[in-house]
Amino acid sequence: MWNQFPDNDISSDLSTLADDMIHLDLRKSSLCFTTITSPTTSVASLAEVEVQVKVDEATTLLNSISSHFSVKPTNYGGRGCFANTDLAQGTIIHECSMPLSSTIARPFRKEVCGSCFKFLCGKTLKFKLMSRKNKQNNSTSVSTSASASDASLALYFCSQPCMDQFIALDIDDLYRESLLNVESLFIKGLNEYQYDLERKKQEEEAEIEAELKLENELKQAKNIELFISQKWQEADINCQLQLSKLKPKQRKNFNNLIYLIPKINENEYMEIKYIIGILFQMYKRDNCENNKLSLSSVSLSSLELQIFQLLQSNEIEKVLKYPYLLHSYTNKIYKFLKMSTLEKLQPYITPSIIRSIIGKSLTNVFGIWSIDEPDENKELFGYSLYPSASFFNHSCKSNLIKIKKGSKIIFKLVKNIQKNEELCIHYGNSINSVLEIRQKDLKEWFFECLCERCLEEMNLKNAKK
C-alpha cells in the first residue's frame, strides 16, 4: 500500500465542477458579446469561465514544479510529466526537500528517525522528544533513563540536528503533542484489552459484525458513491451528537472522552498519524503569519499543499475492492480524530477533508523502506507524501531513478531524453519479476502498465502460443 503511485487526473473538485456543467448542458459563450441574454445563460457562462480559470490556475501550478518538464495529458489517459527540452543522462530534473506528511509503523517508531528516516540496524534511537506536559521530562535533550511508559510517549530521532529541525517546523508544539496524543491513546487501548480479554473478544466480534453489515449494504446500494458519502455524514453526525451531550469543559478533558474514542489497530494508527501531518500543514498555512517560521519552509509546504489538492482520490475504488475499509475509515479513524484531536486542528476534521486525505494517500505515497532498491525482501517502515512528485507515471523500463537522501528525494535521468518524451519512474518491488507478477502488483493500485517493456513481453508471450 505504501509505494508511490501518481495521480493522473485533474483535481476531484475541478472534475466535479466540470461534470456538473456537462449535466447542465452549458454552452460556450464569449463575455465580450453585447447580446442580451437571459439570467440563466449569464450565470451558466460565468460558471463555465470560473471553471476554466480554475483549470488554468491548476495547469500553471503544476507546470511550476520544474523547468525541465510540464504536466500534460497522456495518450493513454490521465496526466504525466513530459520533457520541455532534450535532456542529458544524469540530469536532476526534480527534488523534494521534505515530505508534506509521513508516518512510521509503530514497531519501528524507536528505530527510524522521525525527520530523516534513518535506520540504525534495529538500535533504539537516543534522541527523544517528550511531551512538554510531562513535567519530569520537560526538556528536549537526550534522555536515557526514562521509564518504559515514558519512553513510549516520545518521538525518536537519530541526532540533535534532526530533532531540532522537527522542533523548528512545529508551531507551539502542536504537531508534537498531536502525535504523542495518538500514541498515548493507542497505549491506553492496549492496556484496557490486556486486563479485560473478554471485552476485547466481544469488541472484536462486534467489529467483524459491523464490517459484514456494511459490506452487505454496500453490495445492495444502487448508488455506490452516494451510499459511501452518506456513511461519512452519519459518522460525523454521530460524533456531533455524542459530543453535544458533554459540557464545553468536559470536552476539554480527555478522561471524559476516553470511553467514546474507538480502539484502533496498527494500520489505523499509521493512517491517523499521517492524516494529522496533513491537518497540521493546513493549520500552518492558515497561521504562519503569527509564528516565527522559516519563510522558505512555509512557502515550500504551502506549494506542496496546493498541489496536494490536485491529486486524484481512489477512495471509492479502494472501498469497492476492500469493503471493510469503509467501517475503518468512518467508524474508527474519523471518530478517533473527531473525538481526540487537539482543539486547534478540529476545524479541519470534516468528512470532506478526511476523505480527501485518505483517498489521495492510497495511490500517491512513497514507501519508507529499509533499503532504497527494488528488493522483495526489504522491510517497510512507513510512508510519506511528496505531492509534486506524484505525477511521474510508472514504466517497467523507467528513465528516472529515485535517490533518497534522508527525507529528501531526488529524481535523476538514467538515459538521454528527447523533447516531449515522458519521464517515468518504477513502482513497487517487483520490477525485476516476470510480466504476470508485475501486472498483478500494479493492478492492486488500479494501474495497468502498457510500457515498452510490458508490450514487448506480451508480444513475445503471444508469439509462443
What are these language model-derived features?
Residues 8-16, 30, 34-45, 144, ...:
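Intrinsically disordered, low-complexity serine/threonine-rich segments
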Residues 13, 18-20, 25-36, 42-45, ...:
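Conserved AWS/pre-SET-to-SET junction and N-terminal core of the SET lysine methyltransferase domain
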Residues 37-52, 139-147, 206, 210:
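Compositionally biased, intrinsically disordered low-complexity segments enriched
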Residues 102-140, 148-246, 253-259, 394-465:
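C-terminal SET catalytic tail plus cysteine-rich post-SET Zn-binding segment of SAM-dependent SET-domain
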Residues 238-401:
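Catalytic cores of histone-lysine modification enzymes
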